[in-house]
Amino acid sequence: MTERELWERYQRYLCVVPALDFTLDVSRMRFPADYLERMRPRLEEAFGAMEALEKGAVANPDEKRKVGHYWLRAPELAPEPALQKEITDTVAAIHAFAKNVHEGRVKPQKAQRFTHMLIVGIGGSALGPQLVADALGTAKDPMQVSFFDNTDPDGFDRVLAQLGERLSETLTLVISKSGGTKETRNGMLEAERGYSARGLDFSKHAVAVTGAGSELDNHAKKQGWLRAFPMWDWVGGRTSVTSAVGLLPARLQGLDIDALLKGARDMDAATRERDALKNPAALLALMWHYAGDGRGHKDMVILPYKDRLLLMSRYLQQLVMESLGKETDLDGQVVNQGIAVYGNKGSTDQHAYVQQLREGVLNFFATFIEVLKDRDGGSQEVEPGVTSGDYLLGFLLGTRRALYEKDRESLTLTVPDVSARTLGALIALYERAVGFYATLVHINAYHQPGVEAGKKAAGVVLELQRKLTTRLREARAEARTAEQLAADIGMPDEVETVFKVLQHLAANPDRGVTRTPGATPTQARFQAK
């Protein structure tokens, strides 16, 4: 197409959300002229499914659960008055608690005020709060934020070392919907150890966000933690940013959670429009479907041209891939659905993997995120009449053009700024696009059986390790190979796992296992110290 023809296509297919000053440009997607009309019946089904979900229908049939994250920013949509009250009461409680913390009425054991926050969580209990904290945070926030978002011992040590003496001024939020997530449990115990090493009572610095009656909830009450805030079974971890999971840390950080909720609410309202060209979430879902033939054949590359949106691709990895990566459809047929997501930020990407995007394997479509506002205040000129922000836009438009010249398709999402309201709207936009796409391809977007399978497999490994350590203690004087030890514990077919576990134990001197090299690495012998 000529530049003039592309301009005409841009105008024809530009989706505008006036209330939010958002636009979605799909002109660089090469869908045929009749595509949107052909997809209309399936899109109508998606609109119907979303409407039923918002009214309280069971939208997660595998777990027989309602899906209510849209109620969090519009409590009046919740199907029961009691739920409406719980939602509004929780937001009010978050505001009140944060105010008491900031004003020193809720204070640490041996300091005048909480100045830092440590968030212990994983998956949706960390990725959403991390995105919000990084996108909206400033050096002037009343509380600075750190995270335990894994079960990596060295990671725990690094964060605790960075906090140092400020741990006495640190409020720890332990976030787990089920209350039994092992990574989060481990992080909590490591945090307790850190506080104890400094002569501090962890319970006087701890808050829980969890389901009522969960293992974590009961532990927090028994230990006398400062407070517990609720998570509900109708809110999934990856869609929990507008629940206490995201709102409590954001409010404690000093961010405008009312604006975050309003942005999400306004985007929800805009994406109830049944004309795809006026509904950015529906149009996104259709473009994903077109790009990958409804089978996820192309990856989604997220290119935000703004440092504050660096974590957007990580957040969307979970939201999109955990929601859409499913083996079977709603009828139980094997479909192996999903869309792979990756990205970084522009223009850093231009000096990293854009080379392959333009000239390598054509297995992706790109999403550019353009932010109109450069910064608070004015910008200096780096060249006559040109600012650094002008360069950023130039690189975005230049990369978009360079990709299109090589038949690489892209979407461009334009937002006014990176504010709480805009971020709330972006989060809601992708939540709803995922919901629409799931209906288009007939899958359940709201469960994650593959995650549970991984947890069960990890449990098997740890049970094997317990058997191994018991056997090593019994045969203290005798060094044995992985093959021999696997046979000793009655698991000869698990010899590779046995070898990996022994290798790990021997590499850590405090674990009580020594390794004697063999002719090959796998012939090494292990024994208890």
Swiss-Prot record:
UniProt cross-references to SUPFAM superfamilies, sorted A to Z: SIS domain
Coiled coil: none
Pathway field: Carbohydrate biosynthesis; gluconeogenesis; Carbohydrate degradation; glycolysis; D-glyceraldehyde 3-phosphate and glycerone phosphate from D-glucose: step 2/4
Biased composition, class Polar residues, residue ranges: 517-529
Region (Disordered): 510-529
Top class in the EC scheme: isomerase
Broad class of the protein's primary localization: cytoplasm
Record keywords: Cytoplasm, Gluconeogenesis, Glycolysis, Isomerase
EC number: 5.3.1.9
MF terms in GO: carbohydrate derivative binding; glucose-6-phosphate isomerase activity; monosaccharide binding
Pfam families attached to this UniProt entry: PGI
GO biological processes: gluconeogenesis; glucose 6-phosphate metabolic process; glycolytic process
Family annotation (Gene3D superfamilies): Glucose-6-phosphate isomerase like protein, domain 1 (3.40.50.10490)
List of catalytic residues: 322, 351, 455
Subcellular location: Cytoplasm
Domain of life (superkingdom): Bacteria
Catalysed reactions listed for this entry: alpha-D-glucose 6-phosphate = beta-D-fructose 6-phosphate
GO cellular component entries: cytosol
UniProt-listed NCBIfam families: PRK14096.1
Family recorded in the similarity comment: Belongs to the GPI family.
Function recorded in the entry: Catalyzes the reversible isomerization of glucose-6-phosphate to fructose-6-phosphate.
Protein name: Glucose-6-phosphate isomerase
